């Protein structure tokens, strides 16, 4: 994982992932226990002065790790849906999956010189 960035950036990222999850379930994300926990935890560990707080850094690291997990799960599901085996594929579909196109014969199918 790269540098952590700001806690507010991590918090907004977590809320974005909660919105993606709630869109799948149909419930508003603000009604979930995860949303209430995140807001409560980030408010409790908010630093108002320039003091260093180990608990805030631990919370930020755990939140960034959880954000990485949620993003990875969402991307995995999208890739799985796109490339999951659907039985036997045609040659054109298989070529399209890897970004290739098959050559076309000038006279159409069955063309002979």
From Swiss-Prot:
GO terms for biological process: apoptotic mitochondrial changes; dopaminergic neuron differentiation; mitochondrial proton-transporting ATP synthase complex assembly; motor behavior; negative regulation of lipid catabolic process; regulation of type B pancreatic cell proliferation; response to toxic substance. Residues 94-113 are annotated as: Disordered. The keyword Cytoplasm does not apply. Transmembrane segments: none annotated. GO terms for cellular component: mitochondrion. Keywords: Mitochondrion. It is found in: Mitochondrion. The keyword ATP-binding does not apply. Belongs to the FMC1 family. Interacts with ATPAF2. Plays a role in the assembly/stability of the mitochondrial membrane ATP synthase (F(1)F(0) ATP synthase or Complex V). This is Protein FMC1 homolog.
């Amino acid at each position: 994982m790269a540098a952590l960035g700001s806690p507010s950036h991590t918090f907004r990222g977590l809320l974005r992932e909660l919105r993606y999850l709630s869109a799948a379930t149909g419930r508003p994300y603000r009604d979930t226990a995860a949303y209430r926990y995140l807001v409560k935890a980030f408010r409790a560990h908010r630093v108002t002065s320039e003091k260093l707080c180990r608990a805030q850094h631990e919370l930020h690291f755990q939140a960034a790790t959880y954000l990485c997990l949620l993003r990875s799960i969402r991307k995995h599901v999208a890739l799985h849906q796109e490339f999951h085996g659907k039985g036997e594929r045609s040659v054109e579909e298989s070529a399209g999956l890897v970004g290739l196109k098959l050559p076309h014969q000038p006279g159409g199918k069955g063309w002979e010189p």
